[in-house]
Amino acid sequence: MSDSDEYVDLPVSDEEEWEDGESEEDEEKVGSRKKAKVHAKQLKRLQEKDPEFYKYLEECDKELLEFDDDDFDDNEGSAEKHSSVPKEEPKEIVKPITMQMVDSWCQGAEDGKIGSIRSILEAFRKACHYGEESGNNSAPKFSVMSGSVLDKVMHFVLKNMDRILRELLDAPSFGGKKETVSELMITKQWKRHGRLMRLYLVNALHMITELTDEQMVAFTVHRVRASAVFLAAFPALLRKYVKALLHTWSRGRGAMPLVSFLFLRDLCIQLGSECLDTSLKGIYKAYLVNCKLSKSISGSKLQHIQFLGNCVRELYNVDPQSAYQHAFVFIRQLAVILRGALTERGPKTSKDKKQKESIKPTKKRMEKSYQKVYDWQYIFCLELWTSVVCGCSSEEDLRPLAYPLTQIIHGVACLVPSARYFPVRLRCVKMLNRIAEATGTFIPVSSLLLDMLEMKELGGKPDAVGKAVNLFSVKQVDKKTVKTRAFQEACIFSAVDELAKHLAQWSYSIAFFEMSFLTLVRLQNFCKTVKADRFRREIKDLIHQIKASAEFVSSKRAGIGFSPNDPAVDSFLQVEKEAKSSPLSKYVATLHQRSQDRMDSLDDTSVIVGAESSTFSRRLSEAQKRQDEQDDGEDTIAFSKNLLTEKKKTKTPKEKSKKRAHNHDDVATEEDIVEDLILSSDEEDEDEDKNMESDEDDGSMPVEDDSDDDFVDPDSQWKKQKKEKSKKRNKRQPSKKGSSTTKRKEKIPHPKKKAKH
């Protein structure tokens, strides 16, 4: 088959062809009229100026002299009459694409034949749009192809087209930058064949956005990633790719999020500012969507959110200077939310009390203010920016964000000083310890932990044993759990762990003796008041390690001769710090192993929380190896299994209505679960109980207002109505066993449900 026989024209709409043809015909008619009139005038001039030559033309060339411009107008009118008669358009003959045709196209494309490349790309376009309807006709628009042919086309194009087009366009064999594409767009090869690259990228994007099979989408994204740099030539297509990749990254499972992120990261590195700002904004918003959670969180979901956070941190490390502006805006938003919660929470001075008496915020407004802060979205955003600042602590661009972020985290920890929110406080302490370690800045964390230990809920006698509590999978606990021994044990052990980590960071400082003095005094006082022996032993062990480290530093400090403001202070105990030889550092290692064993016993998933969570580089390399192993096999992914059928499935109105009814039933069952919570007697606990109910209904930030201002003790009213209804039914019906079972019981709607719906 010759090169010209294999050529397949790219699709052009009928309207465009007709308009182009009509405009060309009009131009030709106008031009021919002008030429005819000019020619007739020239002949008249010739007859007047040179009659002898005119006679010669009459004898030799009569046709030239017999020319008349009126004849042209007559011919034109007759042509219009003929054109006004409608002609029957010939029907298109749809030819099926066979395996022999595909094999010949593939071989020709490997040899660099342009006709074969066009044909295989046209077949790829037909495969990507297979099963879609065109206009009002229900018949398929494109040629028929079998499943084996479709698989062959998809695999060949996705695996080899980037290399083939690079050779055709004289582009670098791998990678490239924006400047390379800018130079390439001036060449003749790009002007001739550049639209082939666009055809390949457009249809691949259609596959990514339309397919529902995650394995096929991941394979497509992984293969198209090699051509990412060529999107610099198509800005509109680049924006669509960024939007599609953010969607697959945030909503996908398996290998799809990782492959999508690697594609997005390559775009930001290779193209720079063209897509970096859009990607930084979009990936943060997509991360927020995944953080909409209820009261508690599972281990698998926590691990997934940590992976997404690592991706965000990696993308913000690409260009710290551009990332600073976006990070500053987002951290400022968190500060504004915290400021609103602090101002509405309650007065602190007599002057504030007088001002509050004049303008009293409603109970609903107060609940809404600090629910925005004690929400999973807000907490995970703080952890995200903590990891970003700690990961770029050596960069001067992001280092100034450490101070405002520390202020926000400290304010969140002190917002509601209640034992029910100890999980949030412990998370905040972990974040502050990470910032202090990364930046080398002292942060007064010990006061937050010592205030926890001195609360009456941890020092008093528990009411029950209770179940084991994982403080890092919840953001608050109920009132019954606070009074259990398991909760006391989890809080005290976690506080000791974080306090030891904080002091171990500064156990090599020349001022450690003075720094740890107040902490030592308060721990000794707590040791006297605590009643449980196991808690007393735990605190005594920590006190012993603090004293040993203070003596260790004092002995080393006695042998030096420089003053405290001498620059040589920075080198004090530098060798011991690198070796981690202080007593507190060794004690922290044993505590870390113990806390890890405790977490493993609580969680079957063994999710590590904090700085040691899911390492990005290790996961990246493992996923890359798995993807390469899958790509080695030719038939690893069968596109024909789902591609030929999934696009044809359309939901009927009945199915949609059934789905809406099913979702409505699910919402009702969730509300039933929320109503089983017992309201507390104290005013503060009543607010927190209602907050727990609203958190289960909706975990978004800010929390939507689901309660009513006139909501007062709905359970008692509901029970009274049900008793009255049962009494009336018993009076009307005789007391028979059969009658009570046959008749349907009338359900009394709960007032709280009625108000919500």
Curated annotation (Swiss-Prot):
Region named Disordered: 1-37, 67-89, 616-757
A biological process term (GO) from this entry: ribosomal large subunit biogenesis
Annotated keywords: Nucleus
Comp. bias (Acidic residues): 1-28, 67-77, 668-713
Bias type Basic residues, positions: 719-735, 742-757
Extent of Basic and acidic residues compositional bias: 78-89, 619-628, 644-655
Compartment list: Nucleus
GO molecular function list: protein homodimerization activity
Family the entry assigns: Belongs to the NOC2 family.
Name of this protein: Nucleolar complex protein 2 homolog
